């Protein structure tokens, strides 16, 4: 299930910062916790029970040193989960507390509407609405650190497959019957976003997915890759 949240900027010449994932995440979490603490625990789970998009600004101007100047009357935030209770709680919480603040910019929720979930097959073409994060760990000196992977990295596909199977098992309570899938990257753009006090690298891309329909559906509803609850890995079906 997925929803679109329309946000109305509350000042003239609004400029949206480039980095806002953690602000959106923390405000949604706080709003949901005020009415459904049990659901809020799912939202903060590392297994990724949900995902959300970048803030979609359909008419904009990029200001390299400042952010994104919003030239449209409103912007959109898409939120998705296979758990309808999560989406219901988010919609109710956001309607009850309709203010968002991102950097110096305040928004008011103008509308919330359900988006029709499309039927998927064994082969689909997806486009990302927020970057896909795939990570591994490496030793540097005597320290273990996270290493973000891009699609051209040798470990990317193997790590993505393992992450999706693990997340599916944790969220759905069972392992997928078909675990095999491949992706063919058709377009790719690397990203680096500040989330809290750390940078996270990810991949905006269009990709052809083939294989497990269970994992395709799970990724479509809950996001592909890691850190989906922090606003990564959301996709839309384009073919």
Swiss-Prot record:
Recorded GO MF terms: hydrolase activity, acting on ester bonds; RNA binding
One Pfam family in the UniProt entry: Cas6_I-A
UniProt keyword Membrane, yes or no: no
Domain of life: Archaea
Record keywords, A-Z: Antiviral defense, RNA-binding
UniProt similarity note: Belongs to the CRISPR-associated protein Cas6/Cse3/CasE family.
Protein name as it appears in the record: Putative CRISPR-associated endoribonuclease-like protein Cas6nc
This protein's encoding gene: cas6nc
């Amino acid at each position: 299930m997925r929803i679109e949240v329309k946000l109305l900027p509350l000042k003239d010449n609004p400029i949206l910062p480039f980095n806002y994932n953690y602000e959106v995440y923390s405000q949604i979490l706080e709003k949901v916790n005020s009415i459904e603490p049990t659901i809020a625990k799912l939202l903060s789970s590392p297994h990724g029970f949900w995902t959300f998009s970048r803030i979609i600004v359909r008419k904009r101007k990029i200001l390299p040193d400042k952010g994104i100047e919003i030239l449209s009357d409103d912007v959109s935030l898409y939120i998705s989960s296979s758990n309808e209770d999560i989406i219901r709680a988010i919609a109710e919480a956001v309607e009850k507390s309709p203010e968002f603040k991102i950097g110096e910019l305040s928004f008011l929720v103008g509308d919330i509407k359900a988006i029709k979930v499309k039927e998927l097959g064994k082969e689909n073409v997806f486009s990302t609405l927020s970057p896909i994060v795939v990570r591994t760990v490496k030793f540097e000196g005597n320290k273990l650190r996270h290493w973000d992977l891009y699609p051209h990295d040798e470990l990317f596909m193997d790590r993505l497959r393992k992450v999706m199977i693990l997340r599916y098992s944790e969220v759905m309570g069972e392992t997928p019957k078909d675990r095999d899938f491949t992706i063919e990257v058709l377009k790719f753009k690397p990203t680096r976003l500040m989330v809290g006090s750390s940078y996270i690298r990810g991949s905006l891309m269009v990709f052809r997915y083939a294989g497990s329909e269970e994992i395709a559906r799970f990724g479509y509803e809950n996001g592909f890759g890691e850190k989906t609850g922090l606003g990564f890995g959301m996709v839309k079906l384009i073919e």
